């Protein structure tokens, strides 16, 4: 659900807070894509074997929290580009987490595990955008108790922090 803070509100947030136009949003999303490609396409193969899966999960989730908080409180347009870097590096946690889960399930149940994970992602793809766009709308409305367009990112940080705590306990 936390990831939908970025996926669902990036455009709204950057246009509201920094007055970005469609072209600038496009550049920023292109940069996000480039960073994700670097992490997913190469860095994971280096980092996860060196750190191990569990440490990669903790570090990745922590980097996501840092990224979310930085996005929420960014004050200058350029900061969004800078903060994409730690946020994207958080992507090391996904493959590490899948590796840990796959290691806990026998070979004949791998398909069931992957199906369950896909179903879970589908559910979060329903709940996440609704939650995050409504938070954004609430905190940017004229009658909002406090103007805070970064609220969805802060919610993303809180939800991811719960994931960190859950990962540490298990």
Predicted regions located by residue number:
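Short amphipathic helix-loop junctions that connect adjacent transmembrane helices
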Residues: 8-28
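Loop-to-transmembrane helix entry/capping segments in MFS-fold secondary transporters
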Residues: 22-23, 105-119, 146-149
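Helix-to-loop junctions at the C-terminal end of transmembrane segments
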Residues: 39-53, 136
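Structural signature of the two symmetry-related core transmembrane helices
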Residues: 55-70
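Helix-loop junctions at membrane interfaces in 12-TM secondary transporters
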Residues: 71-84, 93
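Intracellular juxtamembrane helix-capping segments at the cytosolic ends
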Residues: 92-106
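A late C-terminal transmembrane helix in Major Facilitator Superfamily
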Residues: 110-140
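A membrane-interface helix-boundary motif in multi-pass transporters
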Residues: 134-160
């Amino acid at each position: 659900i936390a990831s939908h803070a970025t996926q669902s509100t990036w455009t709204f947030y950057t246009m509201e807070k920094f007055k970005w136009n469609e072209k600038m949003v496009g550049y920023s999303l292109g940069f996000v894509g480039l960073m994700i490609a670097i992490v997913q396409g190469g860095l994971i193969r280096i980092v996860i074997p060196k750190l191990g899966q569990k440490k990669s999960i903790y570090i990745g989730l922590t980097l996501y929290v840092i990224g979310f908080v930085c996005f929420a409180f960014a004050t200058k347009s350029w900061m969004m580009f800078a903060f994409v870097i730690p946020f994207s590096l958080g992507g090391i946690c996904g493959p590490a987490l899948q590796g840990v889960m796959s290691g806990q399930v026998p070979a004949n149940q791998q398909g069931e595990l992957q199906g369950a994970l896909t179903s879970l992602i589908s559910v979060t793809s329903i709940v996440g955008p609704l939650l995050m766009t409504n938070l954004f709308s609430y905190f940017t409305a004229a009658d909002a108790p406090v103007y805070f367009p970064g609220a969805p990112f802060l919610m993303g940080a809180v939800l991811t922090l719960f994931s960190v705590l859950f990962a540490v306990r298990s």
